[in-house]
Amino acid sequence: MLNARPWVPEGPEEYMQALAKRFAGQTPDQNERDLLAFVEENRVIHERDCFNLNPATNAINPKAEAMLASGVGSRPSLGYPGDKYEMGLEGVEKIEVLAAELVAEVFGAKYAELRVASGALANLYAYMIAAKPGDTVFVPSATIGGHFSHHANGAAGMYGVNSYLMPFDADKYTVDVDRLREDARRLKPKMITLGNSLNLFPHPIKEVREIADEIGALVLFDAAHLCGLIAGHSWQQPLEEGAHLMTLSTYKSLAGPAGGLIVTNDAEVAKRLDTVAYPGMTANFDSARSASIAMTMLDWQVYGREYAAEMVRTSKAFAEALVKEGLPVFARDRGITTSHQFAIEAHDFGGGQAMAKLLRRANILACGIGLPLPEIAGDVNGLRMGTPELVRWGMRSEHMPQLAKFIADVLLGRQVPEEVAPAVTDYRRQFNKLHFLR
């Protein structure tokens, strides 16, 4: 049986140990029944009972999901298509090329790196091509949604680069260009990172590229959350505006399988990434994910602009409906958002994660985020919301007032969450068909 881990917080560790004890005492048949039941439990939560407002997740096209169980993924794929180390990969290598070509077309890129297991690892690849351990990279603060993979406790720090938190403009929820320029001239970073886990307004990519060129740095745009909007041309195009490379998560607004991607228009950057990917950080990789990405890109070629535009429209309508219900939506005096995401200020509710746990009891799924506001002890000071999965299931602007009312009823104490949950589930079950699928 799994041993206890004293370094893990007490509550989660007790929960895991109780489950491990149960599973350790069961037969293989019993554990199989449990496994199938857990899979169904997850399906019911996300497809029938709950509204998922987390912009870090989405519903995948069933055809793309089928690619993950197509028998391709168990075939090792070492080396370049056309000259694989293993034999019998004629079908697999064609899948790899097709997926890369479709990714390049959708993102307007000349080069696409698929051999990336996650968005965090995509950022690691980026730091590895730009810097060596001990060098400095500029990254966004968690206060404006900077991801932990940018920071000392994540991929950047594990690799050994020094992550310098860039000065930020709280009103624009992005970096402060003038102060950034001063710091860059003084500290000479090897890479400047833009793109957050919460993106409300456009980032100053062109201005940052000018600064990077002055000091000989690369510009990384982390599009983990924005890649769907970028693919659908409802956001600025980072590669066109000056980013040397763009890292992606494929399962958020892009609605594909779990994993990462990197795209670039710079041949030298592509060459360095190729070397990091192989023989550096990957030998064999999951070709089934490449097939799933290819299937996902076909949806974006046909419906990408429509889907992305609808995510933004619905996000704005949702945020405005929450304001009307009396909730303190962040940046409400500045237009709230131009993306598929926004946030609620958490000070009046005990913190963002406290709010998320309260809403979970009403079958509404969300999560906390950092905001440029006073900190909350033991919690984050914002609650992040987004529309990728809502729109994927057919919700539109006209449906947001009712959803906003459910949320306000819970957060403002009009009703206890368990009283709201049945009505939430009844409303959720009206949206039972995935949209923007070929």
Curated annotation (Swiss-Prot):
Key words, A-Z: Lyase, Pyridoxal phosphate
Listed GO MF terms: glycine hydroxymethyltransferase activity; lyase activity; pyridoxal phosphate binding
Modified residues annotated as N6-(pyridoxal phosphate)lysine in this record: K252
A GO cellular component entry from the record: cytoplasm
One Pfam family of this chain: SHMT
Highest taxon listed in the record's lineage: Bacteria
Coiled coil, from the record: none
Role: Catalyzes the reversible interconversion of alpha-methyl-L-serine to L-alanine and formaldehyde. Cannot use alpha-methyl-D-serine, L-serine or D-serine. Cannot use D-alanine instead of L-alanine as the substrate for alpha-methyl-L-serine synthesis. Does not require tetrahydrofolate (THF) for activity.
Self-association and partners: Homodimer.
Protein name: Alpha-methylserine aldolase
Taxonomic path: Bacteria, Pseudomonadati, Pseudomonadota, Betaproteobacteria, Burkholderiales
Gene encoding the protein: msald
